[in-house]
Design a protein with these regions (language model features):
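Residue-level recognition of conserved beta-strand positions in structured domain cores
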Residues: 63, 86-87, 120-122
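A conserved amphipathic terminal alpha-helix motif
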Residues: 3, 124-169
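Hydrophobic pocket/interface hotspot
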Residues: 31, 41, 59, 74, ...
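Beta-strand/loop substructures that line and gate deep hydrophobic ligand-binding cavities in soluble
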Residues: 17-18, 91-146
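Short beta-edge strand/loop motif at the mouth of beta-sheet-based domains
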Residues: 19-20, 26, 39-73, 80-82, ...
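A short, structured loop/turn motif at beta-sheet edges
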Residues: 28, 75-81, 107-117
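Tryptophan-centric aromatic hotspots in well-structured domains and transmembrane helices
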Residues: 32-35, 44, 77, 86-89, ...
């Protein structure tokens, strides 16, 4: 696990923002497909996704081992540059109040001839959720990188557990 790929947790009152930057040795179009195609998402993000890919469209995800149900409106759909959407999570035993205001922004920046810089911002999360999700999202991004590289995907739980130390403050 590489500490240089650690994200940032920015606390502002009762809310927080998670920020990650990953350099990926793949064209934006490949990364775009991996973050917007339900078949691709199912492999690395461990979710069932329905995406109405357009400005004003919707997302409907059932995510990860916990089975969080998330819906939202697509705020920006600009292939292969920006995918921004609401992240409204229904109440769940691990999130009793759910999340009603969160937004995820995936920004893909061309890096040289064939690489991509992925800037991921997960904003307007409640502070407890952000602290809980930081290492999990780190683990999912490691899985995204492995999928793009055609490597065996790392075990999410092991990666999540190993990344927890990066986000404890």
């Amino acid at each position: 696990m590489n500490a240089s790929q650690k994200g940032k947790v920015i606390i502002e009152g009762d809310y927080a923002t998670l920020k990650y930057e990953r350099r990926l040795a793949h064209p934006r179009e490949d990364v775009w497909k991996a973050i917007t195609d339900p078949k691709e998402l199912a492999m690395w993000f461990d979710n069932k996704a329905v995406i109405d890919g357009r400005n004003g469209g919707t997302i409907d995800f059932v995510s990860g081992p916990a089975g969080f149900h998330t819906t939202g409106r697509i705020l920006v759909w600009d292939p292969p540059r920006v995918f921004e959407h609401e992240w409204h999570t229904a109440p769940h035993p691990q999130l009793p109040d759910g999340e009603s205001e969160a937004v995820i922004r995936w920004e893909l920046i061309r890096d040289g001839d064939s690489g991509t810089i992925l800037n991921l911002t997960f904003s307007r999360l409640t502070k407890p959720t952000a602290l809980r999700f930081a290492s999990g999202l780190h683990a999912y991004l490691d899985r995204l990188s492995a999928q793009l590289d055609h490597r065996t995907l790392p075990d999410w739980q092991k990666t999540h557990d190993a990344a927890k130390g990066f986000y404890l403050s």
